[in-house]
UniProtKB/Swiss-Prot annotation:
Pathway participation: Purine metabolism; AMP biosynthesis via salvage pathway; AMP from adenine: step 1/1
Keywords: Cytoplasm, Glycosyltransferase, Purine salvage, Transferase
Alphabetical list of InterPro entries matching this protein: Ade_phspho_trans, PRibTrfase_dom, PRTase-like, UPRTase/APRTase
Pfam family membership, one: Pribosyltran
Domain of life: Bacteria
Family, similarity comment: Belongs to the purine/pyrimidine phosphoribosyltransferase family.
Function: Catalyzes a salvage reaction resulting in the formation of AMP, that is energically less costly than de novo synthesis.
Protein name (database record): Adenine phosphoribosyltransferase
Quaternary structure, from the entry: Homodimer.
Gene Ontology molecular function terms on file: adenine binding; adenine phosphoribosyltransferase activity; AMP binding
Record organism: Bordetella avium (strain 197N)
Catalytic activity reported: AMP + diphosphate = 5-phospho-alpha-D-ribose 1-diphosphate + adenine
GO process terms (BP): adenine salvage; AMP salvage; purine ribonucleoside salvage
Organismal lineage: Bacteria, Pseudomonadati, Pseudomonadota, Betaproteobacteria, Burkholderiales
Length: 182
């Protein structure tokens, strides 16, 4: 069943060549979200994977990680923690800077977002360089969380992000992968 669902999701993801810049193929999840049956299939893949695990929270990475992360938190009867871009949270925060191709970026979470020992599932839509996900893992761990697994819809392993996540010791689950030639 899960293999079929994963293939349905993969086939529904739109590939947009040369966006946002020439030479890049953007993997667009909006067709998955727009079709209720495919969106349900995607959510079910994650729910079936995590429904028997002892989890306390789902953390979602800004911004598309909020979409899937909040739905999973609801379906699994867990709380949700947003990992935001710098300057978007109103309360005291802890921050982690990470490198981009041409500069740096920062993500933040509230200082009271997790308690020591809480078991957290970290969710985003896509793994490319892995920088944002690794920064989110570090933030959660700094606050004492146990990041049980990082999860995403799409992995682009040829860019190397999944390897960077593996180097943190955090397991990674993705629904599908795309190669540079897909």
């Amino acid at each position: 069943m899960q293999t079929d669902y994963a293939e349905v999701v993969r086939r529904t993801i739109r590939s947009v060549p040369d966006w946002p810049v020439p030479g890049v193929t953007f993997r667009d999840i909006t067709p998955v979200l727009q079709d209720p049956r495919t969106f349900r299939a995607l959510v079910d893949l994650f729910v079936y994977r995590y429904m028997r695990q002892r989890l306390d929270l789902v953390a979602g990475v800004d911004a598309r990680g909020f979409i899937l992360g909040s739905v999973l938190a609801y379906e699994l009867n867990l709380g949700f923690v947003p990992v935001r871009k710098k300057g978007k949270l109103p309360y005291r925060t802890v921050a982690e800077e990470y490198s981009l191709e041409y500069g740096n970026a920062t993500v933040e979470i509230h200082t009271d977002a997790v308690r020591t020992g809480q078991r957290v599932l970290l969710v985003d839509d896509l793994i490319a360089t892995g920088g944002t996900m690794v920064a989110a893992i570090k933030l959660l761990q700094r606050l004492g969380a146990n990041v049980v697994e990082a999860a995403a819809i799409i992995d682009l392993p040829y860019i190397g992000g999944s390897q960077h996540i593996a180097e943190t010791g955090t397991p990674l689950y993705t629904v599908c992968q795309f190669s540079a030639t897909d």
